[in-house]
Amino acid sequence: MVATCLQVVGFVTSFVGWIGIIVTTSTNDWVVTCGYTIPTCRKLDELGSKGLWADCVMATGLYHCKPLVDILILPGYVQACRALMIAASVLGLPAILLLLTVLPCIRMGHEPGVAKYRRAQLAGVMLVLVALCAMVATIWFPVCAHRETTIVSFGYSLYAGWIGAVLCLVGGCVIVCCAGDAQAFGENRFYYSSGSSSPTHAKSAHV
């Protein structure tokens, strides 16, 4: 029973974390920047936000983004963080699907428990890799961006990435280390026996 609960907890935690990583990858509010001194920016109410795909300017009644489409002039850290976040988002999909197939409520024929166990271990390792890719990108990006401009604060995209990476790491570790062995995966099956058929009563007809 404990192993079953841990499997479900690992799946839910990993799924929520993967969604957070996708949100981080697709949005541009990674860091809030200031082109002048911080007091000047606050006085002018003019701040910027920087992400993987665009640089945005936020002013009173104005929000304008400039897409970062010229790969040749992009800083190396932006391209590397893009690759890491895309890899994390793509790798998370098969990991989540593998975890879905090893849940106790899912049964694929009469497969042995060791098959589910191996899929669970593979999915857990993949989720740990997803978490590591996201962690490296979400830590590396603000450090390098701070060298180019003044960072006022971190954006919601970065927080979503940190939370998502931690959740994927926790979920992957739970699946790999705590969700039971091959025997536990074999025992977590639910069988439903159909009720006994009602006896048929034959009626004899007298002519």
UniProtKB/Swiss-Prot annotation:
Disulfide bonds: none annotated. It holds the Pfam family PMP22_Claudin. One of its GO terms (molecular function) is structural molecule activity. Residues 23-82, 144-157 are extracellular. The chain crosses the membrane at residues 2-22, 83-103, 123-143, 158-178. Belongs to the claudin family. This is Claudin-11. The lineage of its organism: Eukaryota, Metazoa, Chordata, Craniata, Vertebrata.
